[in-house]
Amino acid sequence: MTATASEGDDRIIRESGIDARIALIVQPVLRGIGFRLVRVHLSGQNGLTLQIMAEREDGTMTVEDCEEVSRAVSPALDVDDPIEKAYHLEVSSPGIDRPLVRKSDFVTWTGHLVKMETSVIVADRKRFKGKIAEAGENDVLIERDKAAYGEEPTVRVPYDAIAETRLILTDDLIRDALSKDNRARKEAKKRRGEPDDDVPEGAEADATEEHEQES
C-alpha cells in the first residue's frame, strides 16, 4: 500500500500498481451507490482473486450489500478490463479486525489495540503494537503495548508515514464493534422509516460473495 493521491479518495492508505488502477475504476461506482472503498487487493491464490473490501458511510456492510457491490462493479471492470487473466471477484466487509485506512478510522477506533507498519523509520522502528491513544489531524499517538528498555511509552506517528494498520481482535473490540454496528443499523432503519427491530446480539456485518469473471 502507498500514499499516492487520487481524486476523490480520502484514504490515507492507498494501493499501488494494478491494485491502484482497479481502485480508480471501482471507487466512482461505489460512491454512486452509497458505499466507500476500504481496500483493493489482487492475489494469486487459487488462481487470481480480486478482493474488494467496502462499507457504507456508517460502517455497516451486509451480505446483500456485498451482492449489490459485486453486481455494480463487475460491468465497470468488464469495460476497463484491467486484469488480463480470468479471476474471481470477492466482495467483503472490512471485518472486526479491520484495516484502518482513513483518519476517521483512527478516530473511531481510538482506545483499541492495533498493529502498525510504517514506510519509514519512526522512533527507531517500522513496526508498532499498541493502543490508539489519540488521533489528530496530522498524526496518531500510539501507546506501546510493551515498550522496550529505554523506549518512550508512547510514539507519535505521522499519517503519511503509515504503510498499514490493522485492529487486533480483543474482547473489548468485539463488544465495541457489535455495539457500533447495531447502533448504525438502527439509525439506518430509522432514516428509511422501517420498524426498529433489534439486531440479534452477535450479528456481524461481514460477508463475502465470490464471482468469477473472465477477462
Curated annotation (Swiss-Prot):
Q: Which InterPro entries match?
A: Ribosome_maturation_RimP, RimP_C, RimP_C_sf, RimP_N, RimP_N_sf
Write down the superkingdom of origin: Bacteria
User: What does the UniProt entry say about where the protein is found?
Assistant: Cytoplasm
The alphabetized UniProt keywords are: Cytoplasm, Ribosome biogenesis
Principal localization reads: cytoplasm
* Record Gene3D superfamilies: RimP-like superfamily, N-terminal
Region: Disordered, residue numbers: 180-215
Q: Which CDD domains match?
A: YlxS_C
What processes does the entry annotate via GO biological process terms? ribosomal small subunit assembly; translation
Q: What do the Gene Ontology cellular component annotations say? A: cytosol
Q: Does the keyword Membrane apply?
A: no
Offer one Pfam family short name for this entry.
RimP_N
Q: Where is the composition biased (Acidic residues)?
A: 195-207
Q: Which HAMAP family match?
A: RimP
> In which family does this protein belong, per the annotation?
Belongs to the RimP family.
Q: What this chain does, per the record?
A: Required for maturation of 30S ribosomal subunits.
PANTHER family, alphabetized: RIBOSOME MATURATION FACTOR RIMP
The protein's name in its UniProt record: Ribosome maturation factor RimP
